[in-house]
């Protein structure tokens, strides 16, 4: 497996938190925090994919690389596929890692962990999950659960993703973390597929891959990064990063 290419899709048109990638956290735009964490993962080159000049400018001002993509992509995966062809048209990278641009507190170590399942040639897509500890999250439809069985140390094979509380019975529930490592061929196949029945019902893009028979494995990690979707999330991220700076 060649060095992975890390791509960070970032767009300004968020409904709940406008201009989210440029939101100030400790004097630095949020997208810069995410880019720095991805660089610190140390697994391969990092590129921000955006449809907005302002986002590209703040990354390039700090010595990073950004590429401009079309503004009309229906999903982050489609933006990822376009950016991959711009950055690596010769196919030198056979793995691409999609790090969401709204994870400013993400631990670089879990970005590095995300590619581990791809050492198994049967795995098409790799992702992450963490044990749910807070009871209120178990029934929260905004907390996506992964249902799977153990295939190795701290590793699950995904059988389903759902917003419902699942699976039933004793044992841990797992919070899916929306970070993906794709084989290049798997990404090309994925974005060419039509939306699946379960994908449309659950509003979960990854179900398209499972419905098509693609294999997704997940590493179980301890750190659950904060996804910034609302003004309240942004304030929490500011607090968390301020504490880290003090320590």
Curated annotation (Swiss-Prot):
Annotated function: Activates KDO (a required 8-carbon sugar) for incorporation into bacterial lipopolysaccharide in Gram-negative bacteria.
Gene Ontology biological process: CMP-keto-3-deoxy-D-manno-octulosonic acid biosynthetic process; lipopolysaccharide biosynthetic process
Domain of life: Bacteria
GO cellular component: cytosol
Recorded metabolic or biological pathway in which this protein acts: Nucleotide-sugar biosynthesis; CMP-3-deoxy-D-manno-octulosonate biosynthesis; CMP-3-deoxy-D-manno-octulosonate from 3-deoxy-D-manno-octulosonate and CTP: step 1/1; Bacterial outer membrane biogenesis; lipopolysaccharide biosynthesis
Matches recorded under NCBIfam families: kdsB (TIGR00466), PRK05450.1-1 (NF003948), PRK05450.1-5 (NF003952)
InterPro entries: Cytidylyl_trans, KdsB, Nucleotide-diphossugar_trans
This protein's UniProt keywords: Cytoplasm, Lipopolysaccharide biosynthesis, Nucleotidyltransferase, Transferase
EC class (word): transferase
Localisation: Cytoplasm
Pfam families the UniProt entry points to: CTP_transf_3 (PF02348)
Similarity field: Belongs to the KdsB family.
Source species of the chain: Methylorubrum extorquens (strain CM4 / NCIMB 13688) (Methylobacterium extorquens)
Annotated protein name in UniProt: 3-deoxy-manno-octulosonate cytidylyltransferase
Reaction catalysed by this enzyme: 3-deoxy-alpha-D-manno-oct-2-ulosonate + CTP = CMP-3-deoxy-beta-D-manno-octulosonate + diphosphate
UniProt GO molecular function: 3-deoxy-manno-octulosonate cytidylyltransferase activity
Record-listed E.C. numbers: 2.7.7.38
């Amino acid at each position: 497996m060649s060095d992975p290419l890390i791509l960070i899709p970032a767009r300004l048109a968020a409904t709940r938190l406008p201009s989210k990638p440029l939101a100030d956290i400790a004097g630095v735009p949020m997208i810069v925090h995410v880019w720095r964490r991805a660089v610190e993962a140390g697994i391969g080159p990092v590129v921000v994919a955006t449809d907005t000049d302002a986002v590209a400018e703040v990354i390039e001002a700090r010595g990073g690389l950004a590429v401009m993509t079309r503004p009309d992509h229906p999903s982050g995966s489609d933006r990822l596929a376009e950016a991959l062809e711009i950055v690596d048209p010769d196919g030198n990278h056979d793995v691409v890692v999609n790090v969401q641009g709204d994870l400013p507190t993400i631990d670089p170590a879990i970005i590095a962990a995300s590619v581990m399942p791809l050492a198994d040639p049967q795995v098409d897509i790799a992702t992450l999950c963490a044990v749910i500890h807070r009871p209120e999250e178990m029934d929260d439809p905004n907390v996506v659960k992964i249902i799977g069985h153990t295939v190795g140390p701290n590793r699950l094979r995904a059988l389903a993703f759902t917003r419902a509380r699942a699976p039933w019975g004793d044992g841990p529930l797992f919070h899916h973390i929306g970070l993906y490592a794709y084989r290049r061929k798997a990404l090309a196949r994925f974005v060419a597929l039509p939306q699946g029945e379960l994908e449309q019902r659950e509003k979960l893009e990854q179900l398209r891959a499972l419905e098509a028979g693609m294999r997704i494995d997940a590493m179980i990690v301890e750190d659950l990064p904060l996804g910034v979707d609302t003004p309240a999330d942004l304030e929490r991220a500011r607090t968390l990063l301020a504490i880290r700076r003090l320590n």
